[in-house]
Swiss-Prot record:
Cofactor requirement: Mg(2+)
One biological process term in Gene Ontology: glycolytic process
A Gene Ontology molecular function term of the record: phosphopyruvate hydratase activity
Entry similarity comment: Belongs to the enolase family.
Listed pathway(s): Carbohydrate degradation; glycolysis; pyruvate from D-glyceraldehyde 3-phosphate: step 4/5
Protein name as it appears in the record: Enolase
Residues holding (2R)-2-phosphoglycerate: Q162, K334, R363, S364, K385
């Protein structure tokens, strides 16, 4: 067993040009591993706190305080721990911080250390990270939920819904699914050009045109799927991240130019489900609208996946409330929302034990770190959301999944339509 010999953090840049934390952990057997922390654009108010410096430097977004926390206080605390004792390390980090939201040391400091320790332990054990975390049964390759058209907080456009995604549910392998997604992505670019629309991209690599409505986005993507030679609803399905908290105020939703109630939003989603092969809608309602979530789950929860992101913030306590109240039926998993690997895995386990699906997710501010790809396979979650098949910080995760599928060889199983048990394939 190798123990932690040194911990070092530095400030690096993420995909939006903002600072983030990277941590290196060295073990006494010579192993060195590093992890970099992502950052979100649309963030839930119940997320663990990202420590930023304030002031003029980097527009107040510097992370020198978080870096100092790692290099001083955290390093002093965890040097000497066995790297394979992940839960002990994470527990020590949580105790050292001493706040319920990790606001003293910063979730960005704590998470960087937590992930780097796991990666070092895996390397020391001569195991790929997915195998180290998931054991011998880790074998399911996730459906890539590709955000190919951006709106909301991820793009400077007049489209309310934040993400329009494609899900290659009919592919036979992850490799094939990735190809299908890339082909539709390029088809969509051609479709947008043919309609005289802009083909600039948003934070996550998806196109970000100004459109007349949210339905127009779904129509364009449907056209792109068909023109790429695929069957809509059988080969490739659709999914949304509404990020409704972003346009919720004073008990109402400011959507498509009007103020709407939760009931009116539910009626709108029902119309969409009737019109398009939607397998998943993420954050259809606000993180504070528990009554609306419960009613929506009762009306649509047997037809598609209703994913809690801002609602749950990868927090087992909030997820348990959702389970108890019948709100949502799926968990979005973002490691930096909760701040340690152990708590992340606990949230996934709680979801799966209660027949909630789990979708492993990136953030809009990403790095070349590929840890979430391994987590997706380790947990057999069957779904990953990590952007369009463009921009290297997104593609890095997809390429890592290609490597994992190749390593698993005949043991690899692509989740495909089985990832969405509530959806009846069309076509």
């Amino acid at each position: 067993m190798a123990s932690i010999e040194a911990v070092h953090a530095r400030e690096i840049l993420d995909s939006r040009g903002n600072p983030t934390v990277e941590v290196e952990v060295a073990l006494d057997d010579g192993t060195i591993a590093r992890a970099a922390v992502p950052s979100g654009a649309s963030t839930g108010q119940f997320e663990a706190v990202e420590l930023r410096d304030g002031g003029d430097r980097y527009g107040g977004k510097g992370v020198e305080k978080a870096v100092a926390a790692v290099n001083e206080e955290i390093s002093e605390q965890i040097v000497g721990y066995e790297a394979e004792e992940q839960r002990l390390v994470d527990s020590a980090l949580i105790t050292l911080d001493g706040t319920p939201d990790k606001s003293r040391l910063g979730a960005n400091a704590i998470l960087g250390v937590s992930l780097a320790v796991a990666k070092a332990a895996a390397e020391s054990a001569d195991l790929p990270l997915f195998r180290y975390l998931g054991g011998p049964n880790a074998h399911v390759l996730p459906v890539p939920m590709m955000n190919i058209l951006n709106g909301g907080a991820h793009a400077d456009t007049n489209v309310d819904i934040q993400e329009f995604m494609i899900a290659p549910i009919g592919a036979e392998s992850f490799r094939e699914a990735l190809r299908w997604g890339a082909e539709v992505y390029h088809s969509l670019k051609a479709v947008l050009k043919a309609h005289g629309l802009a083909t600039g991209v948003g934070d996550e690599g998806g196109f970000a045109p100004n459109l007349d409505s949210n339905r127009a986005a779904l129509d364009l993507i449907s056209e792109a799927i068909t023109k790429a030679g695929f069957t809509l609803g059988q080969d490739i399905a659709l999914a949304l991240d509404v990020a409704a908290t972003e346009f919720y105020a004073d008990g109402a939703y400011q959507f498509e130019g009007s103020s709407r109630s939760a009931e009116e939003m539910a009626a709108y989603y029902t119309e969409l489900v009737e019109s398009y092969p939607l397998v998943s809608i993420e954050d259809p309602l606000s993180e504070e609208d528990w009554a609306g979530w419960k009613a929506l789950t009762e009306s649509l929860g047997d037809r598609l996946q209703l994913v809690g992101d801002d609602l749950f913030v990868t927090n087992p306590e909030r997820l348990q409330r959702g389970i108890d109240e019948g709100a949502a039926n799926s968990l979005l998993v973002k490691v930096n929302q909760i701040g340690t690997l152990s708590e992340t895995l606990d949230a996934v386990s709680l979801a799966q034990r209660n027949r909630y699906t789990a979708m492993i997710s990136h953030r809009s501010g990403e790095t070349e770190d590929t840890t979430i790809a391994d987590i997706a396979v380790a947990t057999n979650s069957g779904q990953i959301k990590t952007g369009a098949p463009a921009r290297s910080e997104r593609v890095a995760k997809y390429n890592q999944l290609l490597r994992i599928e190749e390593e698993l060889d005949d043991a690899a199983v692509y989740a495909g339509a089985n990832a969405f048990p509530r959806f009846a394939r069309q076509g």
